[in-house]
UniProtKB/Swiss-Prot annotation:
Belongs to the ATPase epsilon chain family. It is a peripheral membrane protein. One of its GO terms (cellular component) is chloroplast thylakoid membrane. Keywords: ATP synthesis, CF(1), Chloroplast, Hydrogen ion transport, Ion transport, Membrane, Plastid, Thylakoid, Transport. InterPro entries: ATP_synth_F1_dsu/esu, ATP_synth_F1_dsu/esu_N, ATPsynth_dsu/esu_N. F-type ATPases have 2 components, CF(1) - the catalytic core - and CF(0) - the membrane proton channel. CF(1) has five subunits: alpha(3), beta(3), gamma(1), delta(1), epsilon(1). CF(0) has three main subunits: a, b and c. It is found in: Plastid, Chloroplast thylakoid membrane. Produces ATP from ADP in the presence of a proton gradient across the membrane. It comes from Cyanidioschyzon merolae (strain NIES-3377 / 10D). This is ATP synthase epsilon chain, chloroplastic.
């Protein structure tokens, strides 16, 4: 089946896949070929896609996914392939984000810190999946 990932900056991914596991707002969602039509919200998290070459991990920064006519279209705020991520840097940023969350004084600061922490944790998880 065909999968496209689109961010505000344009196409990030346009490939044939065999299977995908998405970080939906209700938990992990697995999709195989000929899946029923579906529209779902996506959380910040790791997407795993099985291509002819094997499994690939990408970090998605929240958005929506549509499954229709054996094609998956993913619209997200941002995306990053695991092979582009420096694990040591991501772990350092995750620790900083956790510290920022602990020091957040206002509800708005807490929300922003939680989102930042989720992004860095997803990056660490994506790289760990690829190893």
């Amino acid at each position: 089946m065909k999968m496209k990932i689109i961010t505000p900056d344009g196409y990030v991914w346009d490939r044939e896949i065999e299977e995908v596991i998405l970080p939906s707002s209700t938990g992990q969602l697995g999709i195989l070929a000929h899946h029923a039509p579906l529209l779902t919200a996506l959380d910040i998290g790791v997407m795993r896609a099985k291509t002819a070459q094997g499994w690939v991990a990408l970090v998605l920064f929240g958005g929506f996914a549509e499954v229709l006519n054996n094609q998956i279209t993913i619209l997200v705020n941002g995306a990053q392939e695991a092979h582009e991520i420096d694990l040591q840097h991501a772990q350092q940023e995750e620790a900083k984000a956790l510290e920022q969350l602990q020091q957040a004084a206002t509800p708005t600061a807490q929300i922003e810190a939680r989102q930042n922490l989720a992004k860095w944790r997803a990056r660490v998880q994506a790289v760990s999946f690829q190893i």
